Amino acid sequence: MTWFIDRRLNGKNKSTVNRQRFLRRYKAQIKQSISEAINKRSVTDVDSGESVSIPTDDISEPMFHQGRGGLRHRVHPGNDHFIQNDRIERPQGGGGGGSGSGQGQASQDGEGQDEFVFQISKDEYLDLLFEDLALPNLKKNQHRQLNEYKTHRAGFTSNGVPANISVVRSLQNSLARRTAMTAGKRRELHALETELETISHSEPAQLLEEERLRREIAELRAKIERVPFIDTFDLRYKNYEKRPEPSSQAVMFCLMDVSGSMDQATKDMAKRFYILLYLFLSRTYKNVEVVYIRHHTQAKEVDEHEFFYSQETGGTIVSSALKLMDEVVKERYDPGQWNIYAAQASDGDNWADDSPLCHEILAKKLLPVVRYYSYIEITRRAHQTLWREYEHLQATFDNFAMQHIRDQEDIYPVFRELFQKQSANQSV
């Protein structure tokens, strides 16, 4: 029985190249559709694929066609209404029809087309969702105590496994060896062939000499052919070696206010922000740890499940979370070896005497050691003392950023604003 094995890169997805070209060509429209769709999802369904719709007019391409003027002769087979030389009135183009997602006004005439809708995968969705985003001020530090290595190409070697064989380099060595081993014989062969050509046309004929030359030529050709086309001496393998790499390990502190002033809608918006942050970190970076801290009057380090699903609540003392973060940094994360980040979400409601203490802890202990600290206030009310204290920090520290979220639609734009990739002249 004959077996066919499909080793093509695309395999079953034979239109992958065309699909990628389409995504590149209409990236702006797709990203706009994704940014609108992210706010309509449930908290637990942020990272799945998405049905993307693009207006038909945006994907139309230029084409050559005949002009509207003039007379034309056409053959319409199968009609029973017209005969030869009948003139057919040209139909008027409809301009009042519906087109798009069904959100327009009704029309009694005209034609249109629905928006073009297609499905993108989870990977494509996340790639577009987090495109052009990065952790600010990320630096690579050489960790003495961390044995982190990366494999690099390091030329060629004469020993290795068949999977690493370099066909081109092996054939080059084979050609060089065969040329070196047969060069003298080929020169001698060329001389004998020239001599045989001269003798064969000479008069009188020298049959014995011709026979001798033919024997020598045959022997030389046999010797040349006995040189193997490729030998184990010719084989070369791609060589790889492990080199110590600068480590870009980072830790992200997620500080969420779960006090009684945070209603369920506000908590859901905070969770949406942190889920986006978690997906961004896990999608973009390999060596990023996440520390989850929930706080009301007391702060507690928790795991991922408790951070998102615990129902515990209480009063509001924001400084408790900042103190706990400072303790964890001193205990586990040396600023000289770690890139430290923090994202704090709150409704801004805090005990009045505690807000100046938050300012002091951030200014003296945390901001000098973190790469970037972001504060997100989720409220529709007027800003209170915590926001005003943080405004002074923003004016003093370049690595402190703050944003205001009023509604669910603000989450993704604020997230992109906080983690927008810096240009070369802006990076530290």
Swiss-Prot record:
Q: Where is the composition biased (Gly residues)?
A: 92-103
Return the annotated region ranges for Disordered.
Answer: 78-111
- Biased composition (Basic and acidic residues) is annotated at 78-90
- InterPro entries to which the protein is assigned, alphabetical: UPF0229
The superkingdom listed in its UniProt entry is Bacteria
| Pfam families reported in the protein's UniProt record | DUF444
HAMAP family named in the record: UPF0229
Q: Sorted alphabetically, which NCBIfam families does this protein's record hold?
A: PRK05325.1-2 (NF003707), PRK05325.1-3 (NF003708)
Q: What's this protein's family per the entry?
A: Belongs to the UPF0229 family.
The name this protein carries in UniProt is UPF0229 protein YeaH
